[in-house]
Amino acid sequence: VTEADLAETGWKDDEIKQSKFPVLERADVLGCFNIIDNKEELVAQFAVYPLDMNIYGERYEVGFVTSVCTYPEYTGHGIMKKLMRKSLTRMRDSNKSFALLYPYSIPLYRGLGWEIISNKMTYVIKDRQIPTKLKEPGYVRRVQWDDEQFKKLHTHFAAKTHGCLYRNNLAWEEYFRWDEDDTMVAIYYNEDDEPCGYMVYLISSDVMHIKELIYLNREAQLGLWEYIHAHDSMIDEVRGNNYYSEPIAFELDDSDIKETIRPYAMGRIIDVAQFISQYNCDPDGPGGCFSFEIEDELLPWNNGTFVIDFEGGHCTLTDKKPQHHLSMSIGTFTTLLLGYKSAEKLLQMGKIQATYDAVAKLDDILYHEIPYVSDYI
């Protein structure tokens, strides 16, 4: 699919053109066309934007699926499934072993081998519930959106945070695309003038809206909440997003706040062998050799049994005789290795077929951190 195709046959709304063309120009876009009156008409498309993602300390090249659409009159014909298979194959050929997306239908994508890997939490805190008596040694300074320290701080955060995407220039453009002009950025600096955390926020109608709040250490976390408290005379409540998958209510003296959680990103391992070659496990774990019987109806190269040797924090495919056997779908395998669910929990849910001893030993080997995914492309 070319830019001309999109301009002439697809995206006719000027606002959509403006918002999506920067992404689509840099994405790998596949489309399905129909011939109507001797003219090609784009009826479906599947776009993948390349990004890097931290998966347990390893920087993976991944594909971010975006701008998936089919005209209503062409749904139900398997077009999107064919485009997805072709697109995932192209990702595999370019050495990308993992993809993620934000689903418009979780059941639909689950049926195609995708599974939930992260959460988004939202919270509402009354002004009287904002933490007080915080006296951190650093200070907070507001900066411009294009401040280099702000962007470098996120890169530092991504390098130490499982699941976080590394933002390139386009990702930053998308991050601020729909924000109001009054949106502000505040950075927390420690006593040595080193940036250690930031928050992106907007104050409107007596409400502080926090788009993102990240920190490299506890000091920065508390320092930013101290900054929030400094606004208590200007606001009635704080509304924010939390991608850490850890409720914040327990942190507050008055924990009676409104907090909601919902699934956010879905992921998919495109190529088991490629993914495992980069994957890290717990170096302090007991190690062991496991066979995984994987079922993948969409991508045939993932169908089969993979024997993986976990040793010293690394994983390798091997011909050794396995000590334990597990069977699962590619979606379950994805959510397990990304840390969203433990093997024991998946066994209880009937998603894994194995002995309890096998899943207990596997859980001792794997890391268990839910991915931090906050970006939308």
Stretches found by the model and what they are:
Residues 74-86, 219-223:
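Conserved acetyl-CoA pyrophosphate-binding loop and the N-cap/start of the following alpha-helix
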Residues 28-44, 183-202, 350:
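Conserved beta-hairpin
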Residues 119-211, 218-231, 262-263, 272-286:
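Amide-forming acyltransferase catalytic core, primarily the GNAT-like/NAT-type
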Residues 74, 91-92, 228:
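Hydrophobic pocket-lining residues that define ligand/cofactor binding sites across diverse proteins
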Residues 1-50, 57-64, 130-170, 204-208:
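Short amphipathic alpha-helix that is part of the acyltransferase structural core
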Residues 84, 89-103, 233-243:
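Conserved GNAT acetyl-CoA-binding A-motif
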Residues 65-75, 207-218:
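A short, internal acetyl-CoA/4′-phosphopantetheine-binding micro-motif in the GNAT/acyltransferase core
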